[in-house]
Amino acid sequence: MAINAQEISALIKKQIENFQPNFDVTETGVVTYIGDGIARARGLDNAMSGELLEFSNGTFGMAQNLESNDVGIIILGDFSTIREGDEVKRTGKIMEVPVGEALIGRVVNPLGQPVDGLGDIETTGFRPVETPAPGVMQRKSVFESLQTGLKAIDALVPIGRGQRELIIGDRQTGKTSVAIDAILNQKGQDMICIYVAIGQKESTVRTQVETLRRYGALDYTIVVTASASQPSPLLFIAPYAGVAMAEEFMYNGKHVLIVYDDLSKQAVAYRELSLLLRRPPGREAYPGDVFYLHSRLLERSAKVSDDLGGGSITALPFIETQAGDISAYIATNVISITDGQIFLQEDLFNSGIRPAIDAGSSVSRVGGSAQIKAMKRVAGTLRLDLASYRELEAFTQFGSDLDAATQAKLNRGRRTVEILKQPLHKPLPVEKQVVILYALTHGFLDDVPVDDILAFEEALYDYFDAHYDHLFETIRTTKDLPQEAELDVAIQAFKAQSNFK
């Protein structure tokens, strides 16, 4: 049989062309150091910053330091079984978390894995934890009100949808209570809430989850928790995971309230990681980019344009101060990033004024444009009245010889302080807030004893519910005050039939 060299050559060429190599090419490296939530590895010369890397035990890490000899990695999970010499490989992906409706009502860790014992979360959607914030032209002005249900906030430091409002104060001054009450008040408001617990005790997180469940708020809330017992990388990544979940809803035209409790602990975790990765320390041993740590997080909260769905993320970040020092490094950083701050004072808290909001140091830079018209009309001078009362109260300590006008201001001020008090987990709808503040600013409480103010308030609401519910409905639907004469008649009728003369 004659062998045709040309045919053989053509056959070999065809085989080569059709050859499909089944190689899985992965760049791998070797762990050279492991400890305290970080690892170093050699051989990953092409790793990208923020890339997910997989260790031989299945744990993932994130590339943070790209150096000439090795890569500094933060480990997102258990690192107790990782050893020097273990293999670590590139994945070519960046960190993503599951997102979507399936997460609502669940308690998850910063990787999106459920920790509430209610089974797996069935969702197909994922979002990267690090994404650019919306640009200037992708945003809208804040104009829709977000009601917290707390008179002291809704009247003095109003918050709008898409705003970033810092809650700052010492430990045990009621910061978490303010945020939980704000979440409870979103029931029926078409809002999705995300509570991010950073470095909290697991028992504390359990208590907050039970509170949300008891009041029916878990039906529209996601809880993301990185407890104090977890490695620093998870505390560092938790807020970014929370806002990634929020962005999924925002870009689908929904409104989200996200609470970061608290960013001081995230900054401490980031400082710990940075020092372990041998980054140069700066002021208070924080790394040079600690401002960027918080700015890139909080800038992702926005009211986006109609082209992007018109949704919003409203952020309530917490910062814990030491001895009321709001001029500390992290505190001033976050104050400069946010659109205002609510300062909770220990002295006020201990004297029974709760929420312990210091009206003089608290401000909302953009919330005024979102405040409803009715609240603007009744609370317009409230802040000034309160400030002048505090000033006069300081003067009265030096002498008691006061003229009638000064005495009247002091009397009104004492009643204002009482009215702004509120029991825990009892947020008020805005129409009730407007009515009681109207009664206060128009002098209807001037003859009511200070000790009876809170009882007067409760009785007034019950009376209006029974006889003047249409006034509540008017405020609720029109966002404006009803006829003042009608309000005056209603309040006078209540006083006439009550024991509060």
Swiss-Prot record:
GO annotations of cellular component type: plasma membrane; proton-transporting ATP synthase complex
Cited NCBIfam families: atpA, PRK13343.1
EC numbers, comma separated: 7.1.2.2
Name by which UniProt lists this protein: ATP synthase subunit alpha
Keywords: ATP synthesis, ATP-binding, Cell membrane, CF(1), Hydrogen ion transport, Ion transport, Membrane, Nucleotide-binding, Translocase, Transport
InterPro entries in the record: ATP_synth_asu-like_sf, ATP_synth_asu_C, ATP_synth_asu_C_sf, ATP_synth_F1_a_nt-bd_dom, ATP_synth_F1_asu, ATPase_F1/V1/A1_a/bsu_N, ATPase_F1/V1/A1_a/bsu_N_sf, ATPase_F1/V1/A1_a/bsu_nucl-bd
Membrane-topology descriptor: Peripheral membrane protein
Site (Required for activity): 362
GO MF, one annotated term: proton-transporting ATP synthase activity, rotational mechanism
Any single Pfam family the record assigns to this protein: ATP-synt_ab_N
Subcellular location: Cell membrane
Reaction(s) catalysed by this chain's protein: ATP + H2O + 4 H(+)(in) = ADP + phosphate + 5 H(+)(out)
Sequence positions that bind ATP: 169-176
Family membership noted in the UniProt record: Belongs to the ATPase alpha/beta chains family.
Biological function: Produces ATP from ADP in the presence of a proton gradient across the membrane. The alpha chain is a regulatory subunit.
Subunit structure: F-type ATPases have 2 components, CF(1) - the catalytic core - and CF(0) - the membrane proton channel. CF(1) has five subunits: alpha(3), beta(3), gamma(1), delta(1), epsilon(1). CF(0) has three main subunits: a(1), b(2) and c(9-12). The alpha and beta chains form an alternating ring which encloses part of the gamma chain. CF(1) is attached to CF(0) by a central stalk formed by the gamma and epsilon chains, while a peripheral stalk is formed by the delta and b chains.
